[in-house]
Amino acid sequence: MTYFTGFILILFAIIIKRLTPSQSKKNIVLIANAFWGILLVGYTFNEQYFVPLSATTLFFILAFLFFFSMTYILIARSGRVVFSFGTGFIESKYIYWFAGMINIISICFGIILLYNNHFSLKVMREGILDGSISGFGLGISLPLSFCCMYLARHENKKNYFYCFTLLSFLLAVLSTSKIFLILFLVYIVGINSYVSKKKLLIYGVFVFGLFALSSIILGKFSSDPEGKIISAIFDTLRVYLFSGLAAFNLYVEKNATLPENLLLYPFKEVWGTTKDIPKTDILPWINIGVWDTNVYTAFAPWYQSLGLYAAIIIGILLGFYYGIWFSFRQNLAVGFYQTFLCFPLLMLFFQEHYLLSWKMHFIYFLCAILLAMRKALEYE
């Protein structure tokens, strides 16, 4: 049944491509449905390692994607509007200088932290996770770096583009988090208005290479790497891709529990005294077959709050939000924020990056505003 559902989503993605606006460079509905179709087909071939997905779980995923897609199409086809703050007044050079300064400061702090942890990214990562090591401004420096990558590509300033691409990559590596590496790759792909099949294959190999390198450096494997390093890397990739689905399925089947009011965690300072809100966003571990996981997809906190209705309500809300943004006429600011919006949608299989990551959305939106206020060059 899982295989059939995945096949239906892939077929739906092909059909829906005909219904979405042809002028949209980033066909977000096609990406979402094709990705989930491939993911579910992949789960079928790896089901011996995980729990089988129930009909309720598959229905929830199908319903969410259907209502998201239909709402998006209705909004995006209604017309193209302009996102603008009028005539820009900030010269590009000041954006480059400001972002460059913030990036260099952030990298210096990151290197100091790495030095204090004996140049071990693994030890540094453990310190960041347990709170004994504070961050080094990645939440601001990385979006600014992506912002300048986008700007430099638009202005055809190759030296600036390569410089900020390198800075972004260094920041993503120093973060010790695969999340920031994925964000880096989303922007590398999103900057290009057209990606050939050959480039897509190269990006895929590059993604796998970064994933493997990250696992080796951090020593994070789902099976014993001793003498079987390639097998251990594939096992780790298997867990990252499919464990959230398995855990969500167990939660739907009432074989797992989550802390109450999980979606309110970012607002614990506001409602912490009136509601029972978790003190941490780290979820409980659960056995999913061969392995354990504490990742439950983005669907779990939605399902906790709204039950099966979450597929309809949140599907419509996100479809409306994405439809609005992807109905704007293409410009620098819109393209930058559209690219960011691809990230939380792709990461649904892993964890929630909307309400639980509202600060991230706010920072990237501010960067989009910064690009909107940029003074256009004479030839534009």
Swiss-Prot record:
| UniProt-recorded Gene Ontology molecular function terms | transferase activity
Top-rank taxon, per record: Bacteria
Q: In which pathway does it act?
A: Bacterial outer membrane biogenesis; LPS O-antigen biosynthesis
Question: Where does the record place it?
Answer: Cell inner membrane
Q: Write out the GO biological process terms.
A: lipopolysaccharide biosynthetic process
Catalysed reactions listed for this entry: n lipid-linked O-antigen repeat units = a lipid-linked O antigen + (n-1) polyisoprenyl diphosphate
Q: Which enzyme type, at the first EC level?
A: transferase
Coarsely, its chief localization is membrane
Give Gene Ontology CC terms. plasma membrane
Q: Which UniProt keywords apply?
A: Cell inner membrane, Cell membrane, Lipopolysaccharide biosynthesis, Membrane, Transferase, Transmembrane, Transmembrane helix
Q: Does the keyword Nucleotide-binding apply?
A: no
Topology of the protein relative to the lipid bilayer: Multi-pass membrane protein
What NCBIfam families does the record tag this protein with? glyco_rpt_poly
Q: What is this protein called?
A: O-antigen polymerase
User: Organism source for this protein?
Assistant: Shigella dysenteriae
